């Protein structure tokens, strides 16, 4: 979403 790790969810 905001950062690549957050977009994984």
Swiss-Prot record:
Taxonomy, superkingdom: Eukaryota
Q: What is its main location?
A: secreted
Give the keywords, sorted: Cell wall, Secreted
Tell me where it resides: Secreted, Cell wall
Which GO terms of the cellular component aspect does the record hold?
A: extracellular region
Under which name does UniProt file this protein? 70 kDa cell wall protein
Q: Which organism is it from?
A: Nicotiana tabacum
């Amino acid at each position: 979403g905001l950062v690549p790790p957050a977009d994984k969810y």
